[in-house]
Every structure is written in C-alpha cells, then in structure tokens.
C-alpha cells in the first residue's frame, strides 16, 4: 500500500516502513505523529483519489530525530565599492519513519 501526502506545500509518496526527511516539526524523537492531508491512497487492486483529500485517510509516523541540511552560502557583491557580504544558512529537517497508512 502507498499514499501521496501533502505536508506544508510539499508532496511525498510514502509506504509503510519508509524513512522520510521533512521540514522541521516540533515533536520529540520517539513520538508518534499523524499526517492528515492524504491526497491519494493505492494498492495493487485499487486507487482512491481525493478531491482534494481522501476522506478518513491518515498516515501515522514515528519521529526519529532532527538533522541539518547542507550549508547554503549567500554572497552579495557590488563592484567598484568594496561591498561584500557573506552569510550562510543550514535548513533544519525532521526524520520520520512511516508506521501505517489507514484508509
């Protein structure tokens, strides 16, 4: 069984047991979360497509922990004026494991 879920503007295709990296959420490692915006649920025999969401469908997941992404360097430069600014950013992510898909 698989599902397509939407989480804060991004869509993911998930299956039970899959480890997924999503944008940071405020949840403790080891806790259970529910992702309620299920757009599609399918298996070998049938596919349920929501309009826009599948009624009563929920994806449950376990929070594994947090991690940071690669550093993005932003460099601003203006010629002939000695103007240079260098800043960096590291996005924080949450790693989750999909426990079950309830449709």
Curated annotation (Swiss-Prot):
GO terms for cellular component: cytoplasm; ribonucleoprotein complex; ribosome. GO terms for biological process: translation. It comes from the Bacteria. Keywords: Ribonucleoprotein, Ribosomal protein, RNA-binding, rRNA-binding. Part of the 50S ribosomal subunit. Contacts protein L20. Belongs to the bacterial ribosomal protein bL21 family. This is Large ribosomal subunit protein bL21. It comes from Chloroflexus aurantiacus (strain ATCC 29366 / DSM 635 / J-10-fl). The gene is rplU.
């Amino acid at each position: 069984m698989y599902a397509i879920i939407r989480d804060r503007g991004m869509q993911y295709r998930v299956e039970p047991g899959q480890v997924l990296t999503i944008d940071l959420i405020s949840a403790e490692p080891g806790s259970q979360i529910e992702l309620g915006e299920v757009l599609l649920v399918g298996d070998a025999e049938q596919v349920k497509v929501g309009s826009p969401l599948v009624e009563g469908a929920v994806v449950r997941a376990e929070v594994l922990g947090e991690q940071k992404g690669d550093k993005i360097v932003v460099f601003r430069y203006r010629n002939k004026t000695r103007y240079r600014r260098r800043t960096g950013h590291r996005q924080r992510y949450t790693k989750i494991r999909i426990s079950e898909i309830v449709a």
